[in-house]
From Swiss-Prot:
The gene is leuD. InterPro entries: 3-IsopropMal_deHydase_ssu (IPR004431), Aconitase/3IPM_dehydase_swvl (IPR015928), AconitaseA/IPMdHydase_ssu_swvl (IPR000573), IPMI_Swivel (IPR033940), LeuD (IPR050075). The keyword Protein biosynthesis does not apply. This is 3-isopropylmalate dehydratase small subunit. GO terms for cellular component: 3-isopropylmalate dehydratase complex. Disulfide bonds: none annotated.
Length: 207
């Protein structure tokens, strides 16, 4: 993965509320446990008319050639609701999305996204409405998402967003749970040594 400082990419508008994880990736494609190869199943039942992926749905937004290389997904509230499948995040990343913008996300989906370095940006509904109007009038427009400055630049407008300081720091430095554990390994070692010493003293005292 990469250190996320800022990203400039084409925005695909998916103007649907309450998109659940089964819509993001149907359950029949969850057999694998590695993170690669799920992009082709993203929004499967919306992208394809037949189950064998031989006939695409021409009315689905991601099948529009303008959004072929879209890396930012703009959507409506409660994105990622439903079951806790991490494969939903894997499919979005494998497809090429690096940022999802919405007014709200499911808690479990939000945490899964953070753990996999997919940036979720939460904006007020008025800003989401503005962005949908913008992408409708300027089809194929790109947004700049700056994690350093915590803002989205869309057209002539800069929209600030909030993000947890710890999550921001991890994304900026590409830290995962292993990296964080290694950074405090000396504290863990010191704690373990103290516990061992305490237990030894207690054992000697009671014997």
């Amino acid at each position: 993965m990469f250190k996320f400082t800022e990203h400039n990419g084409v925005v695909a508008p998916l103007n649907i509320s309450n998109i659940d994880t089964d819509a993001i990736i149907p359950k029949q494609f969850l057999q694998k446990v590695n993170k690669i190869g799920f992009g082709k199943y993203l929004f499967h039942d919306w992208r394809f008319i037949d189950k064998n992926q031989l006939k695409i749905n021409p009315n689905f937004i991601l099948n529009n050639y303008v959004y072929k290389n879209a890396s930012i997904l703009l959507t409506r509230e409660n994105f990622g609701c439903g079951s806790s499948r991490e494969h939903a995040v894997w499919s979005l990343l494998d497809y090429g999305f690096k940022v999802i913008i919405s007014s709200s996300f499911s808690d479990i989906f939000f945490n899964n996204s953070f753990n996999n370095k997919l940036l979720l940006v939460v904006l007020e509904k008025k800003h989401i409405d503005y962005l949908f109007n913008l992408v409708d009038t300027k089809i194929g427009i790109s947004f700049n998402v700056s994690l350093i400055n915590k803002k989205i630049t869309a057209g002539d407008l800069d929209i600030p967003f909030q993000i947890d300081d710890f999550q921001r720091l991890c994304l900026l430095n590409n830290w995962d749970n292993i990296d964080l554990t290694m950074k405090i390994n000396h504290k863990i070692k010191s704690y373990e040594d103290n516990i061992s010493s305490f237990l030894l003293e207690r054992q000697e005292f009671t014997s």
